[in-house]
């Protein structure tokens, strides 16, 4: 179930910004929550109400709902876990990206959007090829 992890305080804002934090409960090895907090902070300073949703295992990525998608880094184990779920989101993610959706992918998130990556243990993990 998609859940909201961060939300701007209630007040008048000029804009609304909806951010998907892909697998934010699993992919946060290098402090990627800090990246999301900075996106929220800067957007609020520029007059945007911000809502950040964690889109994780078994959740639908609604390509029409999000203004920005963020996909952070993770350890090999977490990447191998979500690599099994990621194909269920491929069509919507590909459509989102190929039609001008904003995606900030870092480290493992970037790898998982490519063709494949090789774990430290030499195992090949197939990715989305977007």
Model feature map: region roles:
Residues 1-98:
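N-terminal beta1-alpha1 cap of cysteine-dependent amidohydrolase-like domains
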Residues 76-130:
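Cysteine-nucleophile active-site neighborhood
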